[in-house]
Amino acid sequence: MSNSIVIQTNSTVIEDMKQQYKHSLSPKTPQGGIFMAKVPSCTITAYKSGKVMFQGGRAEAEAARWQTVSQTPKTAVKKSVDSHRFAPPASIGTMSIVGSDEVGTGDFFGPMTVVAVYVDAKQIPLLKELGVKDSKNLNDEQITAIAKQLLHVVPYSSLVLHNEKYNELFDKGNNQGKLKALLHNKAITNLLAKMAPTKPEGVLIDQFTQPDTYYKYLAKQKQVQRENVYFATKGESVHLAVAAASILARYSFVKQFNELSKKAGMPLPKGAGKQVDIAAAKLIQKLGKERLPEFVKLHFANTEKAFRLLK
């Protein structure tokens, strides 16, 4: 018998959900709907009214992932994602800052990596000279060359959430947004402890969700960094600390990805496109479906697509 659960939430959480399910979105949206997504054993439909319906065998488990951040419905207000009380000051680009960024959240294969970096204001010219900028504009060779120098120049904290642990935490009701928040907070906390007694003038997080939602995700954590913490989208263009964090996160991710390919005994593609489905199907044939959680993020729609290719 198919279950059906409806929760009431707000526009911020719905936008977060849409981002979370971006690889599973259906081209069809019902009247009054914002999006429809299909994941294994569950269909999720979000409506403009703030209601979200979960249908299918895993409806209860899927809904549980979002209910903790949906307890206080708010009226949807049209405003910029950067319009909030946690926006950085105009002068932040010249300040001594801890910046954090993550890599691997949109890749079916490979881990999620988060890095926090401290850049003293006096180091900014040096980082520019090293070629530090958004890692998306650099190839793997450039990333490696810059990262190897950065490792000896800036204090940092690097965290890797491997696939098996990622899937385990996800199955316990932690959506990807919450996992990112936990890793960012932990990386920043670790770095601040490593730096002590030196204190940064602020902390800049490359914004992946609204700050209020970020702190809701951390509600049960014993240590939460709140002092002079700022959020901004495209944080790498706001301060070089985020750009440096992005480079070190990508460097770590690429190393982990190469190790994973060796473990698989075959080259693994990045991203979440059709080539990933084909590679996953080959991996299942080669190692068996029970080994899949070691290599992939199981909740991606690619899992179902890979199994379809084997039929």
Curated annotation (Swiss-Prot):
Entry EC number(s): 3.1.26.4
One GO term describing the cellular component: ribonuclease H2 complex
Domain RNase H type-2: 95-311
Keywords, sorted A to Z: Cytoplasm, Endonuclease, Hydrolase, Magnesium, Metal-binding, Nuclease
Keyword Ion transport applies: no
UniProt cross-references to InterPro entries, sorted A to Z: RNase_HII/HIII (IPR001352), RNase_HII/HIII_dom (IPR024567), RNase_HIII (IPR004641), RNase_HIII_N (IPR024568), RNaseH-like_sf (IPR012337), RNaseH_sf (IPR036397), TBP_dom_sf (IPR012295)
Residue numbers binding a divalent metal cation: D101, E102, D206
Enzyme class: hydrolase
Biological process terms in GO annotation: DNA replication, removal of RNA primer; mismatch repair
Compartments (UniProt record): Cytoplasm
Catalytic activity, reaction form: Endonucleolytic cleavage to 5'-phosphomonoester
GO MF term (any one): magnesium ion binding
Keyword match Membrane: no
Cofactors: Mn(2+); Mg(2+)
Cofactor note: Manganese or magnesium. Binds 1 divalent metal ion per monomer in the absence of substrate. May bind a second metal ion after substrate binding.
Function, in words: Endonuclease that specifically degrades the RNA of RNA-DNA hybrids.
Family from the record: Belongs to the RNase HII family. RnhC subfamily.
Protein's name according to its UniProt entry: Ribonuclease HIII
